[in-house]
């Protein structure tokens, strides 16, 4: 900010004329401009002074800036609020959105140099609103302000993708209520798979845009000239009057920020005759990884050329999984591998999400409170399970004996009694009552 203000002082002095300082600055440059042959005596003097006086040039520069700012802000006359108002106004004028500086200065003077009155009289006629950027990623698209950080744009669109992925995966299959599809899993959610952990409690940036199912490797950002959005069939960058391509960022360049997002709590498919696990995880985003990305934490689900879903079968049991990360997490249970260890109590877990849930217990925090009885819980899913006591809801139904349960842990405990007598025709997903 200091550099921007310095530029203003050198090129366009503000209302409090800094003639003396600018004159001093011009005089200091005069000898260097007037002498054209060789290195001037003044230049040699400045160079020697810089080399021999232990950063005296830096001190002189700081002192000069101090005099300029002191003369402009006049702290002996102005209060802190007035000084802040001057800085805010100057930054507003050099921020790039002000299109009529003369009008803004006139309104500033007419307001008595009072920021509150100035803001009341200020209209949008004197500024250029931020341009809109049309972003298309993984079949999702939305308009964002050009001032919005790219990281926030990716987070919004990734959440939008994840909000649609569970709905598409669950079409035509009975599923449990959405009360158990959140990131904050409780101690009762012991059967969730790891490797793809994410919060599914998200809000779509633009609910009018549907997922077109295109597996796009890159993030396409198209500049919009504050005009209407393009057709929903895709993003068109052929018309220079409506939009222009501003940037192309590959998904691989963003993998550091995206791979850190976690996925949880979406039902998974099982093989015929197997007991279902309604709280298995599912990837939040459909980012297409390159074939040589061996360090990916979750292999993206993809369809074949004929739309056939690829599946992964466990070699030790008949269970089948949609995603490789689910299979790997499941195989750790067969081997009883618990690589994720709590540093405080040394308890091991099959998946990182279970460890994160467990670590909340050590903090002693219980941020989730029941609205009916004021009882507090450390995890949101525990609160939801508790609330079912008040509502009487039992969303987990046994497909064999039609017995309903409030908690998934009780449901799974009951299902183990049927595990050895499961008929092949029984559906793999429990019905939610």
From Swiss-Prot:
InterPro entries: SCAN_dom, SCAN_sf, Znf_C2H2_sf, Znf_C2H2_type
GO BP: any one term: telomere maintenance via telomere lengthening
Biological role: Embryonic stem (ES) cell-specific transcription factor required to regulate ES cell pluripotency. Binds telomeres and plays a key role in genomic stability in ES cells by regulating telomere elongation. Acts as an activator of spontaneous telomere sister chromatid exchange (T-SCE) and telomere elongation in undifferentiated ES cells.
Zinc fingers classed as C2H2-type: ranges: 312-334, 340-362, 368-390, 396-418
Main location: nucleus
Localization, UniProt: Nucleus; Chromosome, Telomere
GO cellular component: chromosome, telomeric region; nucleus
Name used for this protein in its record: Zinc finger and SCAN domain-containing protein 4
Alphabetical list of CDD domains matching this protein: SCAN (cd07936)
A Gene Ontology molecular function term of the record: DNA-binding transcription factor activity, RNA polymerase II-specific
Record-linked SMART domains: SCAN, ZnF_C2H2
Domain SCAN box: 44-126
Protein keywords: Chromosome, DNA-binding, Metal-binding, Nucleus, Repeat, Telomere, Transcription, Transcription regulation, Zinc, Zinc-finger
Region (Disordered): 162-199, 272-298, 414-433
Residue ranges with Polar residues bias: 162-184, 277-298
Provenance organism: Pongo pygmaeus (Bornean orangutan)
């Amino acid at each position: 900010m200091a550099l921007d203000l310095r530029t203003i002082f050198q090129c366009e002095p503000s209302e409090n004329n800094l003639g003396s300082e600018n004159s001093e600055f011009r005089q200091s440059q005069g000898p260097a401009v007037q002498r054209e042959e060789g290195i001037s005596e003044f230049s040699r003097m400045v160079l020697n002074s810089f080399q021999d006086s232990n950063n005296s040039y830096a001190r002189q520069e700081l002192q000069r800036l101090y005099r300029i700012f002191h003369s402009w802000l006049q702290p002996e006359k102005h209060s802190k609020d007035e000084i802040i108002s001057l800085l805010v106004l100057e930054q507003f004028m050099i921020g790039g959105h002000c299109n009529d500086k003369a009008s803004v200065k006139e309104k500033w003077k007419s307001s008595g140099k009072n920021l509150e009155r100035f803001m009341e009289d200020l209209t949008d006629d004197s500024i250029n609103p931020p341009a809109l950027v049309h972003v298309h990623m993984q079949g999702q698209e939305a308009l964002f302000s050009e001032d919005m950080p790219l990281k926030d744009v990716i987070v919004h669109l990734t959440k939008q993708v994840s909000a649609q992925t569970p709905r598409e995966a669950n079409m035509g299959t009975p599923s449990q209520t959405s009360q158990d599809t959140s990131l904050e899993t409780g101690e009762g959610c012991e059967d969730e798979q790891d490797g793809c952990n994410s919060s599914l409690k998200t809000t779509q940036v633009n609910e009018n845009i549907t997922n077109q199912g295109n597996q796009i490797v890159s993030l396409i950002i198209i500049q919009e000239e504050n005009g209407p959005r393009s057709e929903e069939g895709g993003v068109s960058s052929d018309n220079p009057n409506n939009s222009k391509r501003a940037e192309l960022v590959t998904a691989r360049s963003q993998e550091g920020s995206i791979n850190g997002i976690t996925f949880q709590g979406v039902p998974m498919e099982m093989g015929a005759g197997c007991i279902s696990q309604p709280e298995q995880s599912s990837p939040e985003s459909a980012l297409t990884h390159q074939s040589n990305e061996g360090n990916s934490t979750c292999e993206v689900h993809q369809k074949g050329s004929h739309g056939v879903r690829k599946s992964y079968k466990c070699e030790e049991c008949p269970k089948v999984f949609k995603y490789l990360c689910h299979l790997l997490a499941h195989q750790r249970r067969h081997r009883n591998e618990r690589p994720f260890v709590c540093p405080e109590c040394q308890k091991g877990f099959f998946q990182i999400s279970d460890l994160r849930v467990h670590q909340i217990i050590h903090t002693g925090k219980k941020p989730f409170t029941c609205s009916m009885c004021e009882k507090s819980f450390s995890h949101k899913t525990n609160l939801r399970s508790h609330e079912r006591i008040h509502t009487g809801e039992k969303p987990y139904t046994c497909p064999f004996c039609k017995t309903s349960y409030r908690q998934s842990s009780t449901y799974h405990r009951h299902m183990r009694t049927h595990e050895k007598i499961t008929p092949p025709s029984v559906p793999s997903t429990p019905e939610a009552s």
